[in-house]
A protein has these predicted regions:
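Positively charged n-region of N-terminal signal peptides that target proteins for export
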Residues: 1-5
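Bacterial N-terminal signal peptides
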Residues: 6-15
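Short, functionally critical alpha-helical segments immediately adjacent to catalytic or ligand/cofactor-binding
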Residues: 88-105, 164-169
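Low-complexity, Gly/Ser/Thr/Pro-rich intrinsically disordered linker/tail segments
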Residues: 221-260
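Substrate-binding/active-site groove segments that recognize
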Residues: 110-132, 140, 144-147, 151, ...
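Solvent-exposed, acidic/flexible segments
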Residues: 62-76, 85-88, 108-116, 136-144, ...
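Catalytic and binding regions of secreted/periplasmic enzymes and modules that target cell-wall glycans
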Residues: 151-182
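An acidic, Gly/Ser/Thr/Pro-rich helix-cap/linker signature
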Residues: 15-87, 256-259
Length: 260
């Protein structure tokens, strides 16, 4: 009876998932490409816990994404191109969407600041100035380069981008312990809600990044046919403007469109 109940649950979820993808015109291949860009097996798209989260939370994630787009539209392409220049998958941008809504002045009670919610110690280790006079975590260009550097170092340590994202959230030490307990670095093992190798916040964090990236990739659903946004940014030119000291932490750039 228990086996039958489990089997029926799987069937219901699979049927619901199929209906969801059809209803929302989701392109499986685009979704799979996002997984691959983050070093995740394409089979993860069928993971039951992932599918349940996508079905139940997509509307909320979409609303959060649209709010960030509406408020920070011009910055999205700039940030994605910085990630691209640093050889970091542009899907990583959705980490910042989740952490701060792309708000430059975002601050947490724990002391994390800026678009990427960097802690002081991490920011300083990545070369940013953080003191009583200047906090370069508030500089969107410098902080994005610092976050890209940090994520690249985590990727070098653990070998996969999704592991770098997990470590970004819970810390590299916690991830090492989780991998040791799980005996594997496979995403399904690490995010298993029954085994709890990583905390609930971290499990939700990674799934939310993936799902938000997948929502954003459906351009027709979000922003029509604008080719500049999300996971396919065009090249643009960015030039800094020298300003007075009082505005050092301001996000002031001259942007030249690359449209042809």
């Amino acid at each position: 009876m228990k086996f039958l109940s489990s089997f029926l649950l799987v069937c219901v979820l699979c049927g619901t998932a199929s209906a969801y993808f059809v209803e929302h015109h989701i392109d499986y291949q685009k979704d799979i490409n996002i997984l691959r860009n983050l070093d995740i097996s394409s089979n993860y798209i069928k993971d039951l816990n992932f599918v349940k989260t996508k079905i139940s939370e997509s509307k909320t994630y979409k609303k959060h994404l649209l709010k960030a787009i509406n408020e920070q539209y011009d910055n999205i392409v700039i940030l994605q191109n910085i990630l691209k220049e640093q050889n970091v998958p542009t899907e990583i941008l959705y980490l910042a969407v989740i952490e701060s809504g792309l708000k430059n002045n975002s601050k947490s009670r724990m002391g994390a600041v800026g678009i990427w919610q960097l802690m002081p110690r991490t920011a300083k280790a990545m070369g940013l100035r953080v003191d009583s006079k200047v906090d370069e975590r508030l500089d969107p260009l410098k902080s994005t380069k610092a976050a890209a550097k940090y994520l690249s170092e985590l990727k070098e340590q653990f070998g996969k981008w999704y592991l770098a994202l997990i470590a970004y959230n819970c810390g590299d030490g916690a991830l090492r312990r989780a991998i040791a307990r799980a005996g594997s670095d496979d995403i399904k093992d690490l995010l298993d809600p029954n085994k709890k190798f990583v905390g609930l916040e971290t499990r939700n964090f990674l799934r939310k990044i993936i799902i938000t990236a997948q929502i954003a990739n459906d351009l027709n659903q979000i922003m029509g046919s604008d080719p500049r946004l999300f996971n396919n940014p065009n090249d643009i030119n960015i030039a800094k403007i020298n300003v007075k000291d009082a505005f050092k932490n301001s996000a002031i750039q001259k942007i030249k469109s690359a449209k042809k």
